[in-house]
Amino acid sequence: AHLGVLKAFEEEGLKPGFLSGTSSGGLAAAFYAFGMPLEEIRDLGDKLHWLRVSTLNVPRLGLLNNSELGRFVEKYLGSKKIEESPIPLALVTCDISTGEKVVLKTGSLSQALMATTCIPGVFSPVQEGERMLVDGALVENVPLTVLKEMGASVRVGVSLGSESYRKPENMIQVIINAINIATDQTNLASEGKFDFILKPQLESYG
């Protein structure tokens, strides 16, 4: 969905001046910010599977460790710093030990992407100094406030709200449903505060 919006912008001759993201949107934003063509990003997305880019984690602050995702990112983009992106980029995470929103605009890109996609309970938090970082969707699922701070005059967000939930069949699906419910409530509370929120219809996918 994120890539479809970017493609529509390109077809209209529009190019974002700033990009922000969390979760899968953070991955899409990062690869695009570093200049990867949309078709290549889509192909990478087809190769990416959480259980193939994770390893069993012991001792467990999460069932899995997503360090393999970091290696996946570095394989295709190299050992980049966030601040090196041609399009200014911000990745939103949450410090699970304090509940604080943590916006990453500098530092290791692969480490930041591990953090912003870190589903709490499924993946172990990513250690960043004293902070324990997880998926920023917990605090701002459509991270547009940071774009204003970066200087954007018009902000366009893509919301992948769950809206409908599937009956969970295992522990991981229970955790994901719980997070989706929480982030959907965050989305509702944020509506009306931004310039444009796009809500692609995804019911027929997945």
Predicted feature descriptions by range:
Residues 1-22, 30-206:
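Patatin-like phospholipase
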